């Protein structure tokens, strides 16, 4: 671990992102549970959970980011998660929520890049966040596909077919 003299604001910003990655995992787990338990989309739930929910705490995001923070001399602190007991009315509500969550997370990463880009000694942090933004762009696109497919299948009265076809329009 290197000893950098990051300001408390930079440390907070970095740890807020770490917390956001874990929050995203929790939110995605809740979506997977809703798909599986009462929205009757067990196949979609399994695929979504394995291909989307699992990336947030992994070495793609949270674990990787915490390692970067340690290497840069910032002690990682995972903040509290916000609970969500919401029950979704249908698959459209699920994937609207998912899209909103991922778009907001990408915006947070882009804002962090903008803030850190002007700070000395933050080059490594910025480069890592730029890679996150690149990955997030693909995930936003995937979320938009799911959202549009959910609308189409629900409007056609074919939620059962959405579950069957989910893997076909999952490109991640």
Predicted regions and their residues:
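Iron-associated oxidoreductase/ferritin-like identity signal
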Residues: 1-172
